[in-house]
A protein has these predicted regions:
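Short, surface-exposed loop/turn segments at beta-strand-coil junctions that are enriched for proline
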Residues: 105-107, 191-198
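Well-ordered beta-strand positions in beta-sheet-rich domains
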Residues: 85, 175, 216-220
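Aromatic-lined carbohydrate-binding surfaces of glycoside hydrolases
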Residues: 160-161, 170, 191, 201-209, ...
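Hydrophobic residues positioned within well-ordered beta-strands of beta-sheet architectures
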Residues: 98, 111-113, 186-188, 203, ...
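Contiguous beta-strand segments within globular domains
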Residues: 83-106, 186, 265, 280
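Bacterial Sec-dependent N-terminal signal peptides
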Residues: 1-25
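Surface-exposed binding patches on compact interaction domains or structured appendages
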Residues: 22-82, 102-188
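Solvent-exposed, conformationally flexible loop/turn segments
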Residues: 90-95, 179-183, 198-199
Length: 341
């Protein structure tokens, strides 16, 4: 453990409440699914309907590489030049990304994807487990900064138009049905192994409908001789707050139970792999007066004795810190106490 920092803040900006699905949206629209869907979920209806004129010429399924810089609309034809090959470059230990786009004029009942073998001319191979992919899913949002006055503060929802945007990368969903006149991006990542032999590797992303091949997309990855250290060795000071309370509520498990820690482990491992350095700990009940959908409680039990002295139980604090260290987040602990208002 490198450092312990205690915060007693007098002012703190809230990032706003994070509202979980509860069978209805924040605005009261039914979602048509359980309050806390696991593994997969239904997306909300798109307020923007497909254009009959725009889609009239699309009578089959189209597949192309896109760009990672664009969030492709769900029901608008993607504005791209069809591309069957994309080339990426990276150091050993670096993660490189690409985005493929599927759009179809006919229904696909079982859209899925897989990776072929990636080899260089000398027969060296990038292992299968270096590659991950996921369908890019869509969530509802509204206009950002419409009045030019920033996004914070009270705002009437009726004054801001709603739209569906591509946002989460769903690595749990392995296959999906795709209605006609719909766009579906696929996000691809290669975490180049530290042990990879420098060279240019060629392979394929296979887009299928069930067992029927729709398209082979060529992917070329050039591996440099340079090496990026492991995430826990990075100097970059990444501090994304964790909320164990939100995880317990969403997965409907008792707080600080073994089921709770089991639910948190894959989430916190992803955070560790991103280079997270800080463990978020709270020492008092609602240290900033709630604000978030799942308020932060104390990880230390405060007990005032009959004689006026205080005793403190650090059991939960210790379990939380030890758990976070076990997934690889072990540089600092930021402890938040009371925020006076």
């Amino acid at each position: 453990m490198k450092r312990l920092t205690i915060f007693s803040l007098t002012c703190l900006f809230s990032m706003g409440a994070v509202f979980a699905q509860r069978g209805v949206t924040q605005c009261g629209v039914p979602t048509g699914q359980p309050k806390f869907p696991l593994l997969t979920y239904q997306e909300l209806p798109d307020p923007t309907a497909p254009s009959d004129k725009e889609w009239a010429a699309v009578t089959s399924t189209q597949v192309s590489w896109g760009t990672t810089d664009v969030r492709y609309a769900k029901h608008q034809l993607p504005q791209l030049k069809k591309q069957q090959t994309v080339s990426l470059k990276g150091w050993r230990g670096e993660r490189v990304n690409a985005q493929a786009v599927v759009w179809t004029g006919v229904e696909l009942k079982d859209l899925n994807f897989s990776f072929g073998d990636f080899k260089d001319k000398k027969g060296n191979v990038l292992p299968k487990d270096a590659f991950t992919g996921g369908f890019v899913r869509y969530v509802m949002t509204d206009e950002l900064n419409k009045d030019g006055r920033g996004a914070c503060g009270h705002r009437k929802s009726i004054d801001y138009d709603s739209l569906l945007v591509a946002d989460p990368i769903d690595t749990n969903l392995k296959t999906m049905a795709l209605p006609a006149r719909t766009v579906q991006p696929v996000w691809v990542q290669c975490w180049i192994p530290q042990s990879a032999t420098p060279g240019t590797y060629q392979g394929e992303l296979l887009i299928n409908d069930g067992s029927r091949l729709l398209q082979r997309l060529n992917l070329e990855i050039t591996v440099s001789s340079r090496e990026l250290p492991q995430p826990w060795e990075w100097a970059y000071h990444l501090d994304l707050w964790q909320s164990p309370y939100a995880v317990a509520r969403y997965y409907q498990v008792p707080l600080w139970s073994q089921e709770h820690f089991d639910a948190m482990r894959p989430l916190m491992k992803m955070l560790a792999d991103a280079g997270q350095k800080i463990i978020t700990a709270t020492l008092t009940h609602k240290p900033w007066n709630g604000q978030t959908e799942d308020y932060f409680d104390t990880m230390v039990t405060w007990m005032k004795r009959a004689d006026g002295t205080w005793a403190f139980d650090y059991t939960i604090f210790d379990r939380w810190v030890e758990f976070m260290m076990s997934v690889g987040i072990d540089k600092h602990i930021n402890c938040y106490s009371m925020v006076p208002w």
